[in-house]
Amino acid sequence: GKSLRYLFDSSAQTGKTSHFGVTGLLQAQGGYYVYDSTHNYAAYNANKNAFDIYDTGGVGNSSHQGQFFPFDAADKVFNEENDRLVQNGITADNTASYNGGKPVNHHFGLSMSTRFVQPDGGKTNKDEDMTFEFAGDDDVWVFIDDVLVGDIGGIHDRASLNINFKTGDIKVNGKSDGTLLSKYQEARKDGDTRWYGSTFADGTNHTLKFFYLERGALYSNMELKFNLVTVPESDIIKFDQDGKF
């Protein structure tokens, strides 16, 4: 199939704008980095090249309140009542007439790259399993060392991915989807690193790349939670297919 690299890299493409080094989406909570559109609306602020995070979810639909539409500013999705923000009724349906002439901005993507080290026994210094978790809609792909270890692309409702670095187990929608070792074996890259059972050997260094693509022109919600023991090097890239902020 056709590579989607052009959607996430810095190449010039018709109808595409890229934003590099964007900050502010992930919040530190109890040893984890987290973001959940259910509870916190996120809007991209071009002047700061950062996300503005709000203390309530924005944009709703019948099945999941709190959507991820970062190219729609807060004043488009909220009203202010009694000094607090309330949803103004705009929904994820991309129909101008339904949304009173204000359709939300679909067709965008986000990518994140971070280096991490496998801690002793796959546990953090808080004695918790090191994990990477995602839940949401639309497409998500997770690569480690350029090996596809998490794939929830295609047509689907809200889906989940869990990678446990203590055990090496990978689950999609709560069901087993192999292990880190089996994914590397399928890619014929298991010889590129050291192993302890089905997970990485202690002290090995790796690079995780996360790709999120909203292409369905309907729902867009995202929940991220991870406690990777990181090497200080990360970046976030955002782009809007229509070139809008």
Residue spans for each PLM region:
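Acidic/polar, compositionally biased interaction segments
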Residues: G1-D240
